[in-house]
From Swiss-Prot:
It comes from the Eukaryota. It is an enzyme of class 3 (hydrolase). CDD domains: PAP_phosphatase. Its EC number is 3.1.3.7. Its cofactor is Mg(2+). Belongs to the inositol monophosphatase superfamily. Adenosine 3',5'-bisphosphate binds at residues 147, 241, 264, 267, 281, 294. It holds the Pfam family Inositol_P. Phosphatase activity is very sensitive to lithium and moderately sensitive to sodium. The inhibitory effects of lithium and sodium are overcome by high concentrations of potassium. Lithium exerts its inhibitory action by blocking the products of the PAP hydrolysis at the active site. Mg(2+) 2 binds at residues 142, 145, 294. It comes from Saccharomyces cerevisiae (strain ATCC 204508 / S288c) (Baker's yeast). Binds 3 Mg(2+) ions per subunit. The lineage of its organism: Eukaryota, Fungi, Dikarya, Ascomycota, Saccharomycotina. It catalyses: 3'-phosphoadenylyl sulfate + H2O = adenosine 5'-phosphosulfate + phosphate; adenosine 3',5'-bisphosphate + H2O = AMP + phosphate; adenosine 2',5'-bisphosphate + H2O = AMP + phosphate. This is 3'(2'),5'-bisphosphate nucleotidase.
Length: 357
């Protein structure tokens, strides 16, 4: 199978990071003063973000030492005490993982990348500083997508993608808090521990499994509707990320009455499962550039589930070869078919353009 080793590494790395983030979520919330930092853009970042990024990048480097990584976080400005907290959480997670969830013949560390010291942690985090680009292959990582949801005790996701020559070829998303019965579906046995993992390789379909197992994979597909009035939208919780007022205007124009609001790329997973039909993320300002790690893993999962993923104004595919950001404006993903997706995008474009009319 194409990218077989890469898929194994991505799945097990996301799985282990999902376990850690689920385990420490309540602790991070209870001790925000010591576990959470505010970045320069006023967004929060937690011990969990850094620990998850460290686990995943170390797994990548241990198996593909020459591969580059575009990661969201940097170790710049972190105190030794904070980095020590990251390492301690990783060690505590190792004990739980090795006892209950370890898979044979998989290495998260090796002699070159032992992950034992504070300097090891800093080095691994900063391997995520690659700028991306049009040529070659690199991994794209958001260790906790939806940090504000994580800090509310709600939905978040661990997201990893492999991009080759500007095209996402593999995506893996861990959703540690996802309970499908909350969205009208039946849950799979074993989801209670730490949710689900969704994954896809381009050309090979999209699948999901309880994270506790990650061996029994069920193929998934979007649902196709004939009328926008029957659609359910997927939207974020935070108003700082997308224009909720304009998204409401789009829904009114298309006679869409049902919406689900949740953080993170878990929205892409619900779309791929056929539990909703269109993901709206309209830019608050046209100058805003989406980060590739917020959409890369979801891109290939939606595509392989039969969906469509474009910008919100010109109806063009998202370009993941532009560096660390997308050049296009806004994001819309839908279950299709093409004519309905085009209608949603054209309506979105009209609404966005009317703000300056």
């Amino acid at each position: 199978m194409a990218l077989e080793r890469e898929l194994l590494v991505a799945t097990q790395a996301v799985r282990k990071a999902s376990l850690l983030t689920k385990r420490i979520q309540s602790e991070v919330i209870s001790h925000k003063d010591s576990t959470t930092i505010t970045k320069n853009d006023n967004s929060p970042v937690t011990t969990g973000d850094y620990a998850a990024q460290t686990i995943i990048i170390n797994a990548i480097k241990s198996n593909f030492p020459d591969d580059k990584v575009v990661g969201e976080e940097s170790s710049s400005g972190l105190s030794d005490a904070f980095v020590s907290g990251i390492l301690n959480e990783i060690k505590a997670n190792d004990e739980v993982y090795n006892k209950n969830y370890k898979k044979d013949d998989f290495l998260f560390t090796n002699d070159q990348f032992p992950l034992k010291s504070l300097e090891d942690v800093r080095q691994i985090i900063d391997f995520g500083n690659y700028e991306g680009g049009r040529k070659g292959r690199f991994w794209c990582l958001d260790p906790i997508d939806g940090t504000k949801g994580f800090l509310r005790g709600e939905q978040f996701a661990v997201c990893l993608a492999l991009i080759v020559d500007g095209v996402v070829q593999l995506g893996c998303i861990g959703c540690p808090n996802l309970v499908l019965s909350s969205y009208g579906a039946q849950d799979l046995k074993g989801h209670e521990s730490f949710g689900y993992i969704f994954r896809a390789v381009r050309g090979l379909g999209a699948f999901y499994s309880p994270s506790s197992d990650a061996e029994s994979w069920t193929k998934i597909h979007v649902r196709h509707l004939k009328d926008t009035k029957d659609m359910i939208t997927l939207e974020g919780v935070e108003k700082g990320h997308s224009s909720h007022d304009e998204q409401t205007a789009i829904k009114n124009k298309l006679n869409i009455s049902k919406s689900l609001h949740l953080d993170s790329q878990a929205k892409y997973c619900l779309l791929a499962l056929g539990l909703a039909d269109v993901y709206l993320r309209l830019p608050i300002k046209l100058s805003y550039q989406e980060k590739i790690w917020d959409h890369a893993a979801g891109n290939v999962i939606v595509h392989e589930a039969g969906g469509i993923h474009t910008d919100a104004m010109e109806d063009v595919p998202l370009d993941f070869g532009n560096g660390r950001t997308l050049a296009t404006k806004g994001v819309i993903a839908s279950s299709g078919p093409r004519e309905l997706h085009d209608l949603v995008v054209s309506t979105s474009c009209d609404v966005i353009q009317s703000r300056n009319a």
